[in-house]
Amino acid sequence: MSKNNTSETITRKPMERASKKVFFRRRKGCPLSVPNAPVIDYKNPELLIKFVSEGGRMLPSRITNVCAKKQRKLNNAIKIARILALLPFVFQAK
C-alpha cells in the first residue's frame, strides 16, 4: 500500500484583514481630581456605591477612569465602609 506522492506546489494567500478601522476613545481625566470634586470618605456611601459593581465588587480604574492615587483611597474607603456596615459586602439579587 504505497501512496502516490505528487509534488504539487500549494500557494497560500496571506490572510486578509478586515478593513475595519479601530477607533480609540479619548480617555477622560480622573473624575475625582477635578476642581469641586467630592472628597473620598468612608462616611459617604452615596459616592462609594458608584464605584462598586452590582455584585458588590470594587470596579477597576480602567472602567471608572480614576487615577491610581484616588483608586487606592477609594479601595480603602470602601473596605472601611464595609467593616462599619455602611456598605454591604454583597448586594442582594432582586
Curated annotation (Swiss-Prot):
Gene Ontology terms: cellular component = cytosolic small ribosomal subunit
Q: Name one GO molecular function term.
A: small ribosomal subunit rRNA binding
- Keyword tRNA processing present in the record's keywords: the answer is no
Provide an example Pfam family for this protein: Ribosomal_S18
PROSITE patterns for this protein: RIBOSOMAL_S18 (PS00057)
Biological process terms from the Gene Ontology for this record are: translation
In the UniProt record, does the keyword Chloroplast occur? no
Q: What keywords does the record list, in alphabetical order?
A: Ribonucleoprotein, Ribosomal protein, RNA-binding, rRNA-binding
Q: Which top-rank group of organisms is this from? A: Bacteria
- Function as written in the Swiss-Prot or TrEMBL entry: Binds as a heterodimer with protein bS6 to the central domain of the 16S rRNA, where it helps stabilize the platform of the 30S subunit.
Q: What's the family? A: Belongs to the bacterial ribosomal protein bS18 family.
Q: What is this protein called?
A: Small ribosomal subunit protein bS18
Organism of origin: Rickettsia bellii (strain OSU 85-389)
- UniProt lists the gene as rpsR
